[in-house]
Structures are given as C-alpha cells and as structure tokens.
Amino acid sequence: MASTTEDLAVWAKALYEGRAFPAKLMPQALTGVSAPMLGKEARYGLGVIIRPTPLGTAYGHSGFFPGYLTEMVYFPDHKIALALQVNSSVPRSIGRPPVGFLVELAQIILEGDRR
C-alpha cells in the first residue's frame, strides 16, 4: 500500500472522529495501557498511541519501512490531524521523535487561527 502524508492526515481525522468504524468501537481503541517505551505518560490502545501534549491528549500511530519513518497524530480538543513522513528509518535521525515536530506544527497552526 502506498500513501501520502495528506492521505494519512485525512485517515487520522476520519478514524479518531469515529467515521471509519462504528463509533461504539472507539472507546475500546482509545482505552490504553501504560506504554512508557512510547514516551513519558504514553498509553497504547488498540493500535493507537495515546499521549499527553501541550495541546491536550493526542491520538496517533507511527511506523517505519526501510528508508522511511511515518507519524500521524490527531488532536481531539482542536479537531486537527497531521502527518509526517521522513526519508530515514533511524528513529532519532531527525534530532527528536517525529511526533515532536507535529505537536510544534499544530501549535503554529492554532496560533495562526487565533490571530
């Protein structure tokens, strides 16, 4: 399967807003267990990384394929989804976890909306 960052962001929004599957399944997917290997205070639900951010709770998933890193994240308090793909399969090759870039980008977008 080939996908673009735009496809992933659209998918994340549909998925985490309950439009991809019956909405009654979402509480099961979003009830996570502690997953410290994914970040401080992170939890892992059914295929969902649940983590606190400065923008509130974020839902998402990351992945890699040799030569690529991918991250998608959805901020339910703001109803925005973002995705990032990087040409590297070394997790720290970009200096920090990819989700950090997405949180920062979301903050910039939201600040622009307030102006």
Residue ranges of each PLM-predicted region?
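Catalytic loop of the DD-peptidase/beta-lactamase superfamily, centered on the K-T-G motif
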Residues: 1-115
